Amino acid sequence: MSSLSNQQVDLQLEELPGWQRDGNAIVKTYHFSDFVEAMSFMNQAAFHAEALEHHPEWSNAYNVVEVRLTTGDTGGITSHDVRLAKRMEHIVQPKCL
């Protein structure tokens, strides 16, 4: 697997509202109504990450979840990162503020 080109990343980010490039990663901060909603999102996303065998760097503080996706093997952004970001967006649509 190889990293996506800058142009490929930019095209993918157009379809991922709120996601931004940060160096060799894509990042997003999610805001939920409360801690339970934030944890629910993280739990659901964890199952997707495990199924894809691609795990996020993330943190949680009460109702906020910060996500960073990168592929360590390539040192850049790959289709695995984009795929997991899209799955996260699918989970969060009705829950995120």
Curated annotation (Swiss-Prot):
EC number of this enzyme: 4.2.1.96
Gene Ontology MF terms in the entry: 4-alpha-hydroxytetrahydrobiopterin dehydratase activity
Enzyme class, spelled out: lyase
The family this protein is said to belong to: Belongs to the pterin-4-alpha-carbinolamine dehydratase family.
Record has RNA-binding as a keyword: no
Taxonomic source organism: Psychrobacter arcticus (strain DSM 17307 / VKM B-2377 / 273-4)
GO BP: tetrahydrobiopterin biosynthetic process
SUPFAM superfamilies for the chain: PCD-like
Keywords (A to Z) from UniProt: Lyase
Record InterPro entries: PCD_sf (IPR036428), Pterin_deHydtase (IPR001533)
Catalytic activity field: (4aS,6R)-4a-hydroxy-L-erythro-5,6,7,8-tetrahydrobiopterin = (6R)-L-erythro-6,7-dihydrobiopterin + H2O
The protein's name in its UniProt record: Putative pterin-4-alpha-carbinolamine dehydratase
NCBIfam families (alphabetical): PRK00823.1-2, PRK00823.1-3
Gene3D superfamilies: Transcriptional coactivator/pterin dehydratase
Keyword Membrane part of the UniProt annotation: no
